[in-house]
Amino acid sequence: MLARLRRALLILGCSALAACSEPVNSPYEEHSAAENVLYSAFTTRSPNHLDPALSYSGDETPFTYSIYEPLYGYHYLDRPYRLIPKAAAELVEPVYLDANGRRLPADAPGEQVAISRYDIPIKPGIAFQPHPAFARDEQGQYRYYPMRAPDLRDAFSIGDFLHTDSRELTAQDYVYAFKRLASPRLASPISGVMAEHVRGFKELAQQLAQDDKRSPRPDWLDLRPYTLSGVQALDEHTLRIEVLGKYPQFKYWLAMTFTAPVPWEAERFYSQPRMAQHNLTLDSWPVGTGPFMLTESQTNRRHVLSRNPLYRGEPYPCVGEAGDLEAGLLEDCGKSMPFLDKVVFSLEKESVPLMGKFLQGYYDIPQVERGEYGVAMTVAANDSADKAALYRERGLQLRTAPEAQLFYMGFNWHDPVVGKGDTPEQAERNRKLRQAVSIAFDWEEYVSIFMNDQAQVAHSPLPPGVPGYQPLPQGANPYVYTVKGQTVQRRSLDEARELLREAGYPDGRDARTGKPLILYYDSMGGMGSDATVDWMRRQLGQVGLQLEVRATDYNRFQDKMKRGAAQMFIWGWVADYPDAENFLTLLYGPQSKVDHGGENAANYQSDAYDRLYEQMRFLNDGPDKEAVIREMVKVVQHDAPWMFGYVPNAGGAYQVWVRNAKPSLMIRDSLQYYRIDAQQRVERIQEWNRPVWWPAIPLLLMLAALAWAVRRMARQRRTRAALRKEES
C-alpha cells in the first residue's frame, strides 16, 4: 500500500511540474504552439470541391485561393478594391476589333466592338508544386502513368507516392483550364458565363458534349487536341483571350480561381482507374502554383496546408488605405510572402467549444473565411462589460468593416399601388407613396436594434468599397435625408405625411374611398409575429399606414417573386466582383425577374436608367464611368424602386499575436499575408491555461497524512515483531 501512495504522490508532483511547460489541456502535440503554424477551424464538413472548375463555395476558398494562382488578384489593403497582377506580369488593357477584324480606338463605342482582345504576359519561372503527376524515371518516362492496380493499393494521399517533380507554368496551362470549363464531365457552374463572353467557347462545349458520347468512352477526355478559338497561347508566356463584344468586367473573372491554370498531367494522373475510389482526385488533392499546397487531408477531421517549396515569393504591400499604417498593417512592407510554414484546419462541430479554444489561445483565427466572428464578438463586448474586459485583457483584435453586399426592401414595379403606375399622374402618386414609406422606415433604428449597430445605412444601390460609391454627405439620398454641412438627417414624419396626402392617401386613407391603405410585406418564414415585422408595422403606423404580412415558405416565396405577385419584400445581393455594374444590373429593365427571369427582383424599368446603364457597362474605370454612375444613382433615388436598406459589416477575430489581419470577403487569398509571433503565442497560452492546483492541496495533505500513518503503523509492527523475537 505504501508503494501505491508513493506512486500517487509522484504522479501529482509530475503533473505539477508538467504544468510549468506545456498546458495539460492543449489539443495539439507538444511544442506545436512554438511552430510557425496558424491554427483555425471548420465547422460543417470538409471542402466539397477543390477543383478550380467546380469550386464555388465560401468554405473552399481558403484552400483554392492559397493553392491556385489566377492571372489577377486584389490588392490586400487598398479600398476601393483594385486589381493587381498575380501570375500575370502586368494588368493589360484590351485591344478592340470590329466585325471585320480592324482595330478600333480605345474609346470606341461599345456597339462597334466585336472582339475585345487581351494579350496577357505571364511571369516566367513560375513552377507548379511538387506532385507525382510530374515525376519521371531515369528514361524520362512518367513514373505514375500508366499505373497498375497493385501500385495503387496503399496510396490514399499524395504523400503516399515516393516520387514527385514539377515543371514551369506556361500559357498552355491557362488554355487547358479554360477548355476544362467547357467539359461535359465537369459541368462547371460558370460555363454559361464563359459561353456568353468567350469567343468559341459555346462551339467547343457542343463539340466536347458530342465527342464524349462516343464508345468506348476513354477514362480521360484529353482536351489538348481541341481548339478554343478565343483562348490561345501565343508563346510559352503569352496568353491571348478574345471576349465577345466589349465587356470591361471580364477582367474580374481573371481574378477568380475558375480561370486558374490546370496542368494536363494532373488531370490525366487522376483519371486512372481506381484513383477516385482512393479519394485521389483533383477535387481532393489540387495541383497549383500558389504559396501553399495541401499536404494532409483527413475528411471531416483535419486538413493541412504547407508552404509550397517551389513558390517564388511575392512582396508584402507597402501602401494601403487610411489607417493601415497606424494599425501596423505596413510593418512587413516588401518582405517575401508567405510568412507561415503551415496552416492547420481542424473540425469543430459546435460553436461553443470552438470559441472556448479560441479564448484559450488554441485557435489563432476561429474561421478564416467567415466574416461574422468579429461582428458577433464586438456585439458581445458591447453588451457585456465582463466580456469586453476579457477581450481587452487578452488583446483580441476584433476588426469590422462594411462589405460589398446589400440588403434592400423592394417595391414591385408591376404592383398597381406601389409600382410604376399606368398613367403619368398615377406614376407620380405612386412615386410619392414610395418616398413617404422610405422616409417612415427608420433604417438607422433598424440597424441599431436588429443589427446591433454592425451595419451601415445605404443611400444608393452601391456599398462602400465599390468604385463609384459616394460616402456621406455627398452620397446622401436627398429625397429621404436633408444635408446641413456634414450632418445628414432623415426627413421628418410630417414630410412623409405630406407626401402621402399628395399621393392621394391623407392620414393613410384613400382620398376617394376613405378606406385605410393597407400595404403588404411578402416574406419567407413565420406569420409575421416576430419583432422585425412588429417594428415595420410601427414605422408605417406613425404615418397612418397599415402593414399586412403575407408569409410563405421558401419555394412559394420564390414562385411569387417570379410571377410578380409580391408587393414589398426584402432582398439581398453579395458582389461577385467589386464593380458598380454588379449592383446596378439589379435595376436594369432587361434583367426583370418577371419579364426576363433576371436578377431585377423589383422589376424596375426606367428608360432613362436603362440608357445610362447601357452606356456605363461599356465604360472603363475612371471619371467618365463614375459620372454616369452618379446619374444612375440620382434616377433611382428619385424613382425609389427600393428602400436602400443597409450594408452589413463583416469582420474577423484574431489573436494578439496574429499580424497583418484585415478582414474582407472579397479578398480570398489572405493566408499568405498573415504572420504570427509564435513565442508570444506560447507565453499567452501558458498564462491563460495555468492549471488550478489548489483543489489538489487537501488531497495531497490527506495522502501525505495517510502515508505517514501507514509508515508509522508499519514501523510499530516491525518494532513489536522484533520485541517478540527477543523475548522468545
What is each residue range found by the language model?
Residues 41-110, 287:
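N-terminal lobe/hinge region of extracytoplasmic solute-binding protein
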Residues 74, 307-309, 349, 401-432, ...:
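A bilobed periplasmic-binding-protein/Venus flytrap-type ligand-binding module shared by bacterial periplasmic
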Residues 75-78, 196-238, 242-344, 349-353, ...:
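Gly/Pro-rich hinge or "lid" segments in bacterial periplasmic/extracellular proteins
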Residues 90-194, 240, 354-357, 425-436:
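Aromatic- and charge-enriched surface segment that lines or borders ligand/interaction sites
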Residues 292-293, 456-503, 523-531:
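Structural transition elements
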Residues 295-306, 331-332, 344-418, 444, ...:
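Extracellular/periplasmic solute-recognition and catalytic clefts
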Residues 654-691:
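Long beta-strand-rich cores associated with HINT superfamily self-processing modules
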